[in-house]
Amino acid sequence: MRDNLRQYRAIRDALTHGYPGEPTGRLAQHLATLAAFISGIVASKSTQLPKVASHVPGGTKPESRVKRLARWVDNDPITAAVSFCPSAQVLLAPLALQTLVLVLDGSVVGRGGVALMIHVVYKGRALPLAWLVRQGKKGHVPEALHIAVIEQVQRQIPAGAQVVLLGDGEFDGTTLQQTIQDYHWSYVVRTGSHITVRWDGETFRCETVASCITPGTLVELTDVRVTQEAYGPVMLLCCWAKG
């Protein structure tokens, strides 16, 4: 438990740096619980409350610690803006000295839910920066929510930082691409083979390019317009990896 206490204090002190002054009162209590939560998750390698609580330092009974964590999770005033964003900004400040690589991803959570998340890549790990959760299936999240979660992260990015956003095929909406362009970010997203492509005076489907390549081939088309709206110009890459 001594190691858990040392870890908890280190996490609490690091979280405190995200605030302009020393947190007091209710905010300090919430921050202490957040630090305990993070410390317990790291030590237990689990997000189940009983396992997390068993690694939270303190003289209270495990049942009391579980209730404390559960109350914190269910507390409506505990929002990402209050408890998470300050820490994310502290994390991003040193990382932004180099190009920030962000990953946009959708994951199934709970029963019938989907979480839309943006992570920053750091030493081979994806660290979450922002998320939205809704009922639905993966791949069926409206583009407006893609943009909403992008906007959450954009407010945390240090001014002047170079950003590259990576996304799967569900994130190729042209309104989302324009939003990313407006932020002066670079981006790479997959797209479907059915997408309409306009290049060099010709109009064809993306799968036409794919049918012309062989294993180990990379085709690069520049000054491309995509979809019926002719969004662009963008670069289109079509690759058939070996193996």
Listing of model-derived features with the role each one plays in the protein:
Residues 1-46, 84-85, 95-100, 111-113, ...:
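Single, function-defining residue in the core of a domain
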Residues 119:
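Nucleic-acid-interacting cores, centered on viral/eukaryotic replication and modification enzymes
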Residues 42, 56-59, 63-110, 167-168, ...:
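Active-site- or DNA-interface-adjacent structural scaffold in DNA-acting proteins
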Residues 1, 52, 103-105:
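N-terminal low-hydrophobic presequence detector
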Residues 44-54:
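Short, charged amphipathic recognition helices of the HTH superfamily
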